[in-house]
Design a protein with these regions (language model features):
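C-terminal/domain-edge helix-coil "capping" segments
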Residues: 22-44, 144-145, 157-261
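N-terminal segment of the mature soluble domain
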Residues: 45-159, 204, 208, 212, ...
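C-terminal motif of bacterial Sec signal peptides marking the signal peptidase cleavage site
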Residues: 17-21
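Cleavable N-terminal export/targeting peptides
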Residues: 11-15
C-alpha cells in the first residue's frame, strides 16, 4: 500500500466514524521504560573518582562534574556513593611522567600560559587518555575502596562562538488593530559553551572497562547576552544526566498518547 493510498483509507475511515457519530480525542499519560545499559547488581558501592578535565578555565569541570554526579547518584539509584577527594587525572598523569623521567605532554596550542588548563582540545586529551587502559591502576583503586564500580572519564567545557540564522518572535498590529506575533529569521552572532564528556565505567575488581558513554552538548546565546559559565555548565549537564543515569538504572520517559473515543 502506497502512502497516498494509506492516506485515502485513513480519510475514508475518519469520514465513516464521523458519519456514525461524534468523535472525541483524548490524551492519556504513558511511561516508556529504558533498560539500564550495564548490570550493576554485583556492586554495592560506586566511586566517582575524577576526570581528565579542561577546555575553559572559567570553571573547574573536574570538581563540578564529580560533585554533581555524586549528588545525582545518591538521589537516583541504590548504590552507596563513596565520599572521597576528587582526583585530577591530569595531575596523576603528570606525576607518572615525572616519575618516569619523561616530559609532561605539551599542549597542542604551544607553551602553556600560567593558569590555563593543560587540556584545551581533543588533541591535548589524546596525550592523557592512556590512563584509562591501565587495568592495574584501576584495580589498585578498586582494592583501596572495597571493589566498587568506578566512574571516571573526561570533561571538556569550552567557550565557542558562531554566526548564523536565528528565529525570534516579532510583534505587529494587524488590519483590525489586534496585536499579533510572527516568527522572523535574522542573522546573529552567537556565543556560548560546548560540553564534551565521556563517562567511563570501570569494574573495581578487575580494572576493566565495562562501558563508555561519549556525549556532546552545546548552548548558544546572543553575543550581547552575559551568561555565567557555571550557569551554562549546569544547563548542559541537565541534558547529559538522563543518559548518564540510564547507564546504571532503568529510566522512564514520560509522554502522552492520543486516543479516539
Amino acid at each position: 500500500m502506497t502512502a497516498s493510498t494509506a492516506a485515502a483509507v485513513v480519510a475514508s475511515l475518519g469520514l465513516a466514524v464521523g458519519a456514525a457519530g461524534c468523535v472525541s480525542f483524548y490524551e492519556i499519560p504513558v511511561e516508556i521504560p529504558l533498560q539500564a545499559k550495564i548490570d550493576v547488581s554485583q556492586f554495592q558501592r560506586v566511586l566517582v573518582f575524577g576526570f581528565l578535565a579542561g577546555g575553559s578555565n572559567a570553571i573547574d569541570p573536574n570538581t563540578e562534574t564529580a560533585r554533581l554526579l555524586r549528588s545525582q547518584l545518591r538521589s537516583k539509584q541504590d548504590l552507596k556513593v563513596i565520599d572521597s577527594d576528587v582526583v585530577s587525572l591530569v595531575d596523576e598523569v603528570d606525576r607518572r611522567q615525572a616519575a618516569a623521567g619523561a616530559m609532561a605532554p605539551a599542549p597542542a596550542g604551544g607553551p602553556l600560559v600560567k593558569g590555563e588548563p593543560k587540556i584545551k582540545t581533543d588533541k591535548d586529551l589524546q596525550n592523557y587518555q592512556a590512563i584509562f587502559s591501565d587495568k592495574e591502576f584501576w584495580k589498585a583503586i578498586g582494592e583501596r575502596y572495597q571493589s566498587p564500580l568506578i566512574i571516571t572519564g573526561s570533561v571538556l567545557f569550552s567557550e565557542m562562538t558562531k554566526s548564523g540564522m536565528v528565529s525570534k518572535p516579532q510583534q505587529y498590529v494587524d488590519s483590525t488593530g489586534q496585536t499579533r506575533y510572527q516568527e522572523v529569521h535574522e542573522w546573529a552572532d552567537l556565543k556560548g559553551y560546548a560540553l564534551d564528556s565521556k563517562f567511563i565505567f570501570i569494574d573495581g575488581r578487575t580494572g576493566e572497562q565495562l562501558y563508555t558513554e561519549p556525549l556532546h552538548e552545546e548552548s548558544l546565546y546572543p553575543a550581547t547576552q552575559n551568561t555565567p559559565a557555571l550557569s551554562s555548565y549546569f544547563e548542559l549537564m541537565d541534558k547529559v544526566l538522563p543518559s548518564f543515569l540510564n547507564t546504571l538504572s532503568t529510566q522512564k520517559i514520560r509522554g502522552t498518547r492520543i486516543l479516539i473515543k
